[in-house]
Amino acid sequence: MPRGEIRDYPKYAVRSFVFDVARKAVSMDMLKDVAKNMAWYKMNDLQVHLNDNLIFLEDYYDEDDPDPTDAFAAYSGYRLESDVAKDGTSIASADYHYTKEEFGSFIQECRKMGMNIVPEIDVPAHAMAITGIFREYAVNGWTPNNSRRSLVDHLDVTRPEVVAFIKTIFDEYIEDRTFDENTVIHVGADEFMADATAYREFMNEILCHIKQTNPVRLWGGLTRIVDNKTEILPEAVKGSQINLWSKDWADG
């Protein structure tokens, strides 16, 4: 005889995990295994953090002859094939990266089992895999509250040509459909320590740019990175997904 009814359903619509494959390379086979295990446990969103660098750049500070560019010696990774290159050297890591074909297929395969893959390209900070190749686009200075930490992992978004350059990185994957129109694209936006006005203007521009074709996600930072004058456009934030990782950086 029936003794009751079990109703089993998730409490939250987005059940996510962020996997940093940038600072330490992770094979595609392992990524697939993680996605399958997540799906088994009713998780449905795997955010793949594709680029970053070792965070403690103050470890690369020379007491006798301090120079922000010393921090370029720190390890960085960019794990997705890219046509963006300088003098024949791509921003994609030579030691290990995924081809566009295999990553695009990974997105499609996971979608069939109810798992959304969210590729994250972290800009304008955490970007030394990019600035290490395009050093002329880096912020050459020190973190305001830490005079020993270099800012060379920051792209200098005070310059229009750098903002345009960043767009080309995303556009490549959108135009060749590595990221199709259903792919949520994460633009990073994490922990920018340089010019707050330039950061907020950049967020208005990059969010609106990506939203022309794709849903967009970003790390919360707009509460902390302020200049008391540059408003974030309603059309930039409407519908954008935010990783609320710290109330100090974004309070919702």
Protein language model regions, located:
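Feature activates predominantly on carbohydrate-active enzymes
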Residues: 1-152, 161-163, 167-182
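A general structural signal for short secondary-structure junctions and capping/turn motifs
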Residues: 8, 109, 232-235, 252
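Residues within well-ordered alpha-helices
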Residues: 34, 106, 206, 251-252
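A generic structural signal for well-ordered alpha-helical segments
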Residues: 38, 110, 210-211, 252
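Active-site neighborhood of glycoside hydrolase catalytic domains
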Residues: 130-135, 141-241, 245-250
